[in-house]
């Protein structure tokens, strides 16, 4: 992944970088539980290889996005995640979902397959 691709992806308010990988070639996208925040994944960057960027999903209605209306339908959330991760298609992308986040990750994988997009390298 180029730094430009990562910078483009991070322009989306849905994504937050956790730490900063040196010349990342892969990314892990953390999907928090219902009511959770990207803080759940703080410290995890130290557990990943140096070439893997940790990203976390920032749900609307939480933290810095407190004034943003929450999603009412899973399909709307999935659409936003697909848009946010479009710049990351040239790299290995892993989705890690906690509780409801796992369901979100599964729905994202299904929609990527339905659209013929490159599937994530892993879903946990």
Q: Where does each model-flagged region fall?
A:
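Domain-scale detector for complete catalytic domains at protein termini or as standalone homologs
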Residues: 1-124
């Amino acid at each position: 992944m180029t730094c430009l691709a990562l910078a483009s992806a991070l322009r989306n308010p849905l994504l937050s970088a956790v730490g900063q990988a040196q010349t990342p070639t892969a990314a892990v996208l953390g999907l928090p539980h219902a009511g959770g925040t990207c803080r759940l994944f703080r410290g995890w960057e130290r557990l990943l290889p140096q070439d893997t960027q940790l990203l976390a999903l920032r749900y609307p209605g939480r933290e810095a996005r407190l004034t943003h209306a929450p999603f009412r339908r899973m399909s709307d959330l999935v659409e936003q995640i697909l848009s946010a991760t479009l710049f990351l298609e040239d790299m290995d992308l892993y989705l890690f979902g906690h509780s409801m986040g796992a369901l979100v990750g599964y729905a994202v994988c299904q929609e990527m397959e339905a659209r013929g997009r490159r599937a994530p390298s892993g879903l946990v």
